[in-house]
Amino acid sequence: MSYKIVALPGDGIGPEILSGTLELLKLISEKYHFEYHLESHHFGGVSIDYYGTPLTNETLQSCKNADAILLGAIGGPKWTDPNNRPEHGLLKLRKSLNLFANIRPTFVTKGASHLSPLKQDIVEGTDLVIVRELTSGIYFGEPSYVKKTEALDSLKYSSQEIERIVRIAFNLANRRRKKLTSVDKENVLSSSKLWRQIVNDVKKDYPEVEVNHMLVDACSMHLITQPTQFDVIVTENLFGDILSDEASVIPGSLGLSPSASFGQTGTRLYEPIHGSAPDIANEDKANPFGMVLSLALCLRESLNQNDAANELESIVYSFIQSNKTTADLGGQYRTSEIFKLLKEKYL
């Protein structure tokens, strides 16, 4: 079987971290004997420069036909038109592909716990995933308005929107340590009451998964004081936005964190959570690990290459433990040097 992969290098450091990652993918495919077809398209700010839009119809159609999308990074101060920003392309892409679930792993190995801003004995052994609902909730609720003396936002969820994200989280927990924490604000919000009810209903289909309901304020505290207690966390859009950013600092650098966006079926999108960092673009300083770990997610979730994903993650973590890192992690290696060392593992 041959997989179709679309590469979207994007802006800033995106092209340099993605190009090295694609070279790695080629070596990995040769070792693990799978085939893929690769297409690359301009996306984000660079697409605005070339075509006047962050997402062309050609790029969108290519993404719709793909098994997986690898995205570098988008955005930057160059593109200031509020009606035509690079980020609009990503929002349209997510909506067009119905990517309603955002998956963010947070992992801290023993040898990397010193990088965290938290105490080593607190973070060592952290291995959690936050599953955030991405396309509903208060960010998309209607009515919504701002007037001179008042403003309104609407928080609405349907049972179908809740169930589909909850099932993704249950399936993920079932493959991991079988612990699911559902985060809500059930003591105040009506939508959270429905959320908790749906979680309890779906739980009947996953008898082996232990479910714990937690209020969002308590979860935000426990993420910092006892992150190792969590396996899979599932929550709605606003809460997930905040909690996933909170969790992303636990490993010690935004440059370490991968992410994936899932729909019910079809194309999935993989990208590091960091921005385009235009201040260091083309300076060979960017931390590539978030992008490389996003490739590992892609190998596991879209290309059915679990062994390859495990090996790639192990190599990255061994580099971090031995201080083969870029400057943001206290190392002295340049981006190109990290990729050279990574590729040597497959030669």
UniProtKB/Swiss-Prot annotation:
This is 3-isopropylmalate dehydrogenase. Homodimer. Substrate binds at residues 94, 104, 132, 217. It is an enzyme of class 1 (oxidoreductase). GO terms for biological process: L-leucine biosynthetic process. It is found in: Cytoplasm. Signal peptide: none annotated.
